[in-house]
Regions:
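Active-site rim/loop-helix segments in enzyme catalytic domains that contact anionic ligands
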Residues: 18-132
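Secreted/luminal cysteine- and crosslink-motif detector
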Residues: 8-9, 94
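Metal-dependent de-N-acetylase/amidase catalytic core
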Residues: 2, 8, 18-34, 111, ...
Length: 272
């Protein structure tokens, strides 16, 4: 048998043996979600996170940046916006059922993630994977055709997370984590990627039962919606809130008449 034929058989076996369990039905598992900004997690995965929280899963949200640049308000400062975005993310997670203690802030500046030291960034996130040993990782799809056109933090978060997932399982990557911190290698059993293209989506979570929860969590990010994005105010006018919620509900993705969140499910090396 030629080596390349053997390789194909191994890849096929990996695909057949490593099919992920239904994400939304998992119970008592450890879930890690990596997001470039506070709000990408809510907008893309809020319904799924609410279902996972209801099922008593341990959910850890890793946020690469503090999102301290996204305001048109001329009186806003980066320091103030970072504090606002932190409070908004904590409120969104509370609505979804995730305690604020489970939010891990890496504290990079908005738009600057791509200019961080790549080795240090991979080492940092590899250490988190080894520490929390997730059964599932959710992250931006690194294989998406349009990932290169995403804003800088999205590109870097997608690629860095998948690099960390791969490094985490091999003990010779960042061996100091094992020697000094007692962090053993960890192979992530299942990965689900969000911000997925329509043609690449192969996994859909029905969020009918939690769509209102997701919308409420999304609207906790007050500073990212008008009018607050132009002139910051900390709360919603009630009439505008209901109007915006209706608009978000109307744009929410549906499949066969059901509200859904779309992912690309991948397992190990065979489908990344």
């Amino acid at each position: 048998m030629r080596p390349k034929d053997l390789c194909c058989l191994v890849l096929m076996a990996g695909t057949l043996l490593a099919q992920p369990a239904k994400l939304e039905n998992m119970q008592g598992k450890t879930i890690m979600l990596f997001t470039p900004h506070p709000d990408d997690d809510t907008f893309c995965c809020g319904g799924t996170l609410a279902l996972l929280a209801k099922n008593q899963n341990r959910i850890h949200i890793v946020i690469y940046t503090n999102d301290d640049k996204g305001s048109y308000d001329p009186e806003m400062t980066s320091e103030r916006l970072a504090r606002i975005r932190k409070a908004e993310e904590e409120e969104a997670c509370r609505i979804l059922g995730i305690p604020k203690e489970n939010i891990l802030w890496l504290q990079y500046h908005d738009g600057m993630l791509e200019y961080a030291n790549p080795r240090d960034l991979v080492e940092q996130t590899t250490g988190l994977i080894r520490k929390y040993r997730p059964d599932v990782v959710l992250s931006i799809d690194p294989g998406s055709e349009n990932v290169r056109w995403h804003k800088t933090d999205h590109r870097m978060a997608a690629m860095n997370t998948i690099d960390a997932i791969r490094a985490a399982e091999w003990h010779l990557y960042f061996p100091n984590q094992r020697l000094h911190d007692g962090l053993e290698p960890w192979k992530v059993p299942a990965e689900f990627f969000y911000y997925v293209t329509q043609k690449d989506a192969n996994y859909f979570v029905n969020i009918d039962s939690v769509v209102e929860t997701k919308l409420s969590a999304a609207l906790a990010h007050v500073s990212q919606f008008p009018p607050a994005v132009e002139r910051y105010r900390p709360d919603w006018d009630p009439a505008r809130l209901e109007k915006m919620k209706a608009a978000l509900r109307g744009r929410a993705p549906k499949r066969d008449g059901h509200y859904i969140e779309a992912f690309r499910a991948a397992t190990g090396f065979s489908e990344q």
